[in-house]
């Protein structure tokens, strides 16, 4: 809870020891009497979307194919970052914000999986789906409209689960993992032929310089090697990026050597 201070006239003011707590014209009353059906309710915040109404197969996919891969990959990356941050104040300062941002959704995924398990959400969803199926079966028109809903949902989620897991591993390891990939994608986005020298200078100033301000190449080299390794272990061979063929052939599958060579030539 934050207390907002204002000037003597109850208007915004610079700091002064004479400032007083702001007095609003209206306040939202808080009742301790509980609530009744049809009482007014509101959500504080701005949720852009919700997964509250996911079916049981959707919840299962979120747990197994989204959260678990994210927890694993970010855990590996953050452990590498943390070791370097503990060993160097310079690295700690550079990576403090990055670490906090990465661990935020990492903790979210861990907490979500624990909560879904503790509350037996999948079992509850299945009970709701069974009740829905029973309701549909009681009426011919309902069967005509909704008869295939659950089958289609099950088929849609189960048939896409493997690809969702692959997508999560690749995205977490490369788009959100090794920072050098982000740098490469940033540079690729520049339309060199269609840009003036001044526009390129502005791009370099606004993006590239700020990137290197809080970047440690030797640390990112370790992350790249670790990300390459975990993807190779978790993603089926037929779904691996083509670069893995080069690494296997030229570097004998040694991702640390590959990463060292990449950074040596970058």
List each model region and its residues.
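Terminal presequence/propeptide segments associated with secretion/organelle targeting
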Residues: 1-266
């Amino acid at each position: 809870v934050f207390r907002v201070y204002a000037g003597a006239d109850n208007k915004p003011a610079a700091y002064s020891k004479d400032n007083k707590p702001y007095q609003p014209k209206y306040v939202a009353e808080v009742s301790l009497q509980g609530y009744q059906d049809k009482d007014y309710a509101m959500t504080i915040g701005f949720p852009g979307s919700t997964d509250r109404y996911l079916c049981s197969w959707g919840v299962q996919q979120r747990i197994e194919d989204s959260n678990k891969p994210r927890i694993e990959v970010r855990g590996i990356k953050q452990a590498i970052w943390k070791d370097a941050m503990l060993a160097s104040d310079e690295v700690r300062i550079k990576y403090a914000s990055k670490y906090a941002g990465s661990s935020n959704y990492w903790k979210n995924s861990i907490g979500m999986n624990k909560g879904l398990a503790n509350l037996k959400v999948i079992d509850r969803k299945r009970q709701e789906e069974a009740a829905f199926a029973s309701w549909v079966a009681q009426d011919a028109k309902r069967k005509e409209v909704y008869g295939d809903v659950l089958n289609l949902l099950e088929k849609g989620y189960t048939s896409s689960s493997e690809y969702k897991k692959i997508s999560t591993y690749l995205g977490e390891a490369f788009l959100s993992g090794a920072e050098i990939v982000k740098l490469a994608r940033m540079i690729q986005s520049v339309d060199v032929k269609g840009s003036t020298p001044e526009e390129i200078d502005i791009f370099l100033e606004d993006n590239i310089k700020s990137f290197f301000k809080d970047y440690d190449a030797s640390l990112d080299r370790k992350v790249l090697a670790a990300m390459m390794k975990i993807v190779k272990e978790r993603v089926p061979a037929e779904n691996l990026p083509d670069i893995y063929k080069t690494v296997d052939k030229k570097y004998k599958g040694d991702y640390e050597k590959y990463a060292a060579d990449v950074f040596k030539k970058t």
